Every structure is written in C-alpha cells, then in structure tokens.
C-alpha cells in the first residue's frame, strides 16, 4: 500500500521542485520583524545559497526559521544537511532550538520560513492527510519515552507495525527480533509502568526502529537516565546507525557527546553556532561493545 | 480495513480503562432510563390533559315542548355550524334516568320530568367553545353572529365559562411544566454524556498523541474509539431496557389492573420504545466519541 504512494509523492516532489527553484528566492516577508539585524556578522548559516540538492543528504535544512506565536524564536535561519547513515548530535542548552528541529522534522508544525527536505521530499508539500505515511519513515524517541501505557512491551512495538497495515504474521516474525536486538526479550508481556526508565527507553527505541526507518530522531533520549543506562541507550542507537539508519540525537549531555566523537551541530537561542563536520571523528567501524567500553572510559 | 483488529483494540481499551468505561456505561444507562421513563410519562400526562380538555362541552337545551322533528332540525343546524366537531343527543328520558340515579328522592318527589332534550356539542378545539356558544345563541347579546343558528325551539345554550377557563389553564400549565422538565432532562443528559466522553478522552489524549507520532492515520485511531462508544452505548442501552422491562412488568402492569387510569391514555407501546431508546443510546455514544476525538487528532 505504501510504496506506490511514496513513488507518487517522489515524482510529484521532483516536478514541483523544478518549478520551484526558480521562484524560491527567500520568502522571509512574514517574519521580518522578529529578526534582529544589528551586531551580527553574517556567517555560513545566514546565507541561503541555492546549491543543487545533494542526493546523499537525508535531511536538508535551508534558511529554516521558526517563530512561535508567543514571540519566542525556535530556530533562526538554520542551514545544514545530514548525510545518509550519518550519526549527528544536536547540542545546546534548553531553549536553543534542538526540539524545534525535531518537531519540524516530524512535521508537527511548519517553519516560518525556509525549506526542509527529508529524503528529497519538501516537507511543505506533504498534505495533512499524508503526514501519517510520512511519519512511518521516521523513528522518534523522546526523553519521556511516550509509550502507550495500556499496552505491553510487545504490543507497543507491534503498534508501530500495525499502523502500517502489517499482517499478524509479519508482526509475529518481526517484533521478537527487534525486542531481542534491544535486549527486551524477557519483558515481552510487561506493561511500561512495570519497567525501569532505561528499559522503557529501550522499548521506545525498539518501536522507533520497528519499521526500519531510514531516519531516526532522538530528542534527549538519555535525559531521564543515569550514566550507565545512558551508555546502553547510546550503544543501541549506534547499533541501529551501523545497520544503515541515519541517527539524529538532540542532547545536552556534553560528556556523552565528547566521548562519542561524532558530528556535532550546536545551537544557541535558535542559531547554529557550530557545525563540526571536520571534527576528529571517533572510529566508525568499532563494534557496539568497543563503543561501550570507550564511553565508560575503559 | 480490518474490522477484527479494531474490535479487538476497542475491547482491549475498555478492559484496560475499566473505570472510565464504567462511568460512561453508567451515564448512558441512567440517561436512557430517564428518557425511557419520561417518554410514556409525558405522553400519559398529555393524554390526560387532552382528555380533560375534551370534556369542555357546550350544552344546547331544547324547549321542553320540542318534538322529535324539532330535535332533528336543531341537530342538523348545530352540525352545520362552524367549529362543531360532534353532537351527542341526550333525550329527556335519558337525562331523567341519569339525574334520578344521582338524586333519586328529589326526582321521585317531583313526579314529572322537568328536563329538556339536550345536545352535547363538542367543539373541534377546546378553545373554540366560546365561538360555538356564540353561534348557537339566538342573537346572543343583541348582536347576531353570522351563520348563527336561529331555532326558536332552542331554549338556551350554556357552557360554564369559568369552569372551561379553569380546565384550559390547568391543562396548559401541566403541558408547559412537562415540556420544561423534558427539556431540562434532555439537556442534563447531554451534558452528562458529553462530560463523560470528554473525561475519558482527556485521559487518553497522550495516547492519541503517541499514536499520531508513530504514524497512525486519523481513522486508524478513531475506529477503536467509535466502536468502543458503540459497544458502551449498546450495553448501557440494553441494561436500561432490562430495568425498564422489569419495572413495567412488576409495577405498571400490576397497577394497570387495579387503576384503570394508568392504562387509559394512549402511550407508546414497549417495542417501539425499546427501538427508539436503543437507537438513541448507540448513536449518541458512537457519534459522541467519534466527534469529540477530532480535537485531539490535530497534531
């Protein structure tokens, strides 16, 4: 059911995109008054360059701003691209715009200006009706887990498959595998309330990964967890990343970020202040166990 | 779509949210019960009021010397007058028999029949009795009404005006009271159901939010809720009907054999009542849960 629709979207996207690149030169009129023009030297993130769309990037932000109706600035002209199979940290203090990026990516709301593309789809062109189908291609993990309290661990993960119209047989085949991968085989019939925070977050990751999405978003996935449990979750995300999924993690756990040594995008009051693409990356071929040892400082 | 999945989902949800489900069930039961009692009561009251109003008659008294031929002429005249619904003839002899029953000594002492032939005229509407009266009065008050019946053999026409007005006022009051009560009850029931639905949905707002995040379509989320509303409505309605049936068998049926009053006015019979109540319970709770969800689906 889903693939033909997706094909259709892709084709339509491409056609519109061609028509659009000519007209799109900056639609900033609506929110001009929020922009403070003084004492700012233009940096890379400010210039909206019409570069050709990179087919390798899965997330592509161009001059994206988000101003909330309260007057708060969520994001201010952010431009960045995330490549397929990359593991990217989004860091910054509370209110810096990390969550805004995440919420824009799941199309919870529209940007005030700028353009977001995910896997080649311009998000502004996905109609409200199509949002559910779009979201099935994105796994999301939150600080507060967001599990369904009335369902067992198994059923929580199965739900992500059920919404896509998966058959009972598919679910029977898939769910136990995913739960084994996330180390929850023994907790199959427990309800979320009976699990520890770390276990609940594992269920959330398992659910996010159930459809094998090309992109996984994690908003403060370790925010409520102790350091050792956090390492376990990061290992899990790393394993998923190694399986080919692009992972975008928003966090303020600078310790963890420093140890993981992956690409870091730093936000401050909605502005991108650092994009460490050239930073010294940690080894990308280490095993999950090796990563765990490194994070524990062994 | 997969109805089996949705049915299982709604059953699971009812089981896992036992307390809100029970609250919804109880409110549907109570509302259905109240309406189920109220429909026949309103009908009976209206029937009774109308029966009382139907007794507003205009009596046309003939001269005591009137012959059968005079009576026949008068009868046709009266029947042709506007606003007259029906005419009942009470002959001298019948009147005497009736009155003698009430007061046998007096009539025996009298020794002859002082009563005239009488026509009991029923106006087509209780409020029209004054018009009928005017038409049947010969030149009543010096200003003859157009089309008035002029028959020299009619001695007098009467309806006790004060009595009629009293009856009309009282029955109108009863009808208005019942209407106000019915409106109040319906509003109260609707508020009760709306509140229950909103409460149980509010507790699941987060659940809906999570479902949307995982990529569930609106109808994928909505179907189990709608089915749940349908089941709860059906169960609550059925329970209310069982209670009503028990009440009818034990209370009403035994009463009606004792007091003829209860059974007299035409009320809705039990089967249509059941169908109406069931349809109301199910549709209100199904639509209610389906529609109230809409607000939470906006994410």
Feature map (PLM): residue ranges:
Chain A
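ABC ATPase NBD coupling module
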Residues: 123-139, 168, 240-242, 283-286
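Helix-to-loop junction immediately C-terminal to a conserved catalytic motif
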Residues: 106
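Conserved catalytic motifs of ABC-family nucleotide-binding domains
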Residues: 212
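Conserved ABC transporter NBD signature motif
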Residues: 114-122
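Catalytic Walker B motif of ABC-type/P-loop ATPase nucleotide-binding domains
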Residues: 216-219
């Amino acid at each position: 059911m889903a693939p033909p629709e997706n094909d259709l979207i892709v084709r339509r996207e491409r056609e519109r995109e061609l028509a659009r690149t000519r007209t799109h030169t900056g639609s900033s009129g609506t929110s001009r008054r929020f922009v403070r023009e003084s004492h700012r030297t233009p940096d890379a993130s400010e210039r909206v360059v019409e570069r050709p769309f990179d087919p390798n990037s899965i997330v592509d932000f161009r001059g994206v701003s988000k101003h909330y109706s309260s007057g708060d600035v969520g994001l201010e002209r952010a431009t960045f691209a995330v490549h397929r199979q990359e593991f990217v940290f989004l860091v910054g203090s509370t209110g810096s715009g990390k969550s805004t990026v995440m919420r824009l990516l799941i199309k919870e709301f529209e940007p005030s200006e700028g353009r977001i593309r995910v896997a080649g789809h311009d998000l502004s062109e996905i109609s409200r009706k199509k949002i559910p189908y779009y979201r099935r291609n994105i796994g999301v993990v939150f600080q507060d887990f967001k599990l369904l309290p009335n369902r067992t661990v198994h059923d929580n993960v199965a739900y992500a498959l059920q919404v896509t119209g998966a058959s009972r047989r598919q679910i029977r085949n898939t769910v136990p595998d995913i739960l084994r991968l996330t180390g929850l085989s023994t907790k199959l019939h427990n309800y979320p309330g009976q699990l520890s925070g770390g276990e609940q977050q594992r269920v959330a990751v398992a659910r996010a990964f159930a459809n094998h999405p090309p992109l996984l978003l994690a908003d403060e996935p370790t925010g409520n967890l102790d350091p050792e449990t956090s390492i376990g979750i990061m290992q899990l995300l790393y394993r998923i990343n190694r399986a080919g999924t692009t992972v975008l993690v928003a966090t303020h756990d600078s310790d963890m970020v420093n140890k993981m040594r992956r690409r870091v995008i730093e936000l401050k009051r909605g502005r991108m202040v650092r994009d460490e693409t050239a930073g010294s990356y940690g080894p990308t071929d280490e095993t999950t166990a090796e990563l765990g040892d490194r994070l524990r400082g062994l | 779509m997969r109805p089996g999945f949705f049915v299982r989902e709604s059953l699971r949800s009812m089981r896992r949210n036992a307390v809100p489900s029970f609250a919804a069930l109880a409110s549907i039961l109570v509302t259905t019960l109240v309406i189920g009692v109220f429909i026949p009561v309103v009908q009976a009251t209206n029937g009774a009021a109308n029966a009382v109003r139907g007794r507003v008659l205009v009596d046309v008294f003939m001269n005591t010397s009137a012959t059968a031929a005079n009576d026949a002429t008068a009868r046709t005249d009266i029947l042709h007058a506007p606003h007259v619904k029906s005419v009942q003839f009470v002959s001298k002899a019948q009147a005497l028999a009736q009155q003698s029953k009430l007061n046998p000594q007096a009539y025996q002492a009298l020794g002859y029949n002082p009563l005239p032939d009488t026509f009991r005229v029923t106006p087509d509407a209780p409020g029209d009795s004054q018009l009928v009266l005017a038409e049947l009065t010969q030149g009543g008050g010096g200003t003859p009404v157009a089309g008035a019946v002029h028959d020299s053999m009619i001695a007098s026409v009467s309806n006790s005006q004060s009595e009629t007005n009293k009856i009309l006022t009282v029955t109108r009051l009863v009808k208005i009271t019942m209407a106000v009560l019915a409106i109040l009850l319906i509003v109260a029931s609707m508020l009760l159901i709306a509140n229950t639905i909103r409460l149980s949905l509010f507790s699941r707002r987060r659940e809906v939010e999570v479902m949307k995040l995982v990529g569930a379509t609106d109808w994928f989320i909505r179907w189990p809720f709608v089915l749940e509303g349908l089941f709860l409505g059906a169960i609550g309605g059925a329970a209310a009907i069982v209670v009503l049936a028990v009440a009818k068998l034990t209370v009403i049926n035994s009463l009606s054999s004792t007091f003829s009053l209860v059974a007299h006015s035409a009320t809705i019979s039990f089967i249509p009542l059941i169908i109406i109540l069931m349809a109301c319970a199910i549709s209100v709770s199904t639509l209610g849960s389906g529609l109230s969800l809409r607000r939470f689906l906006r994410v």
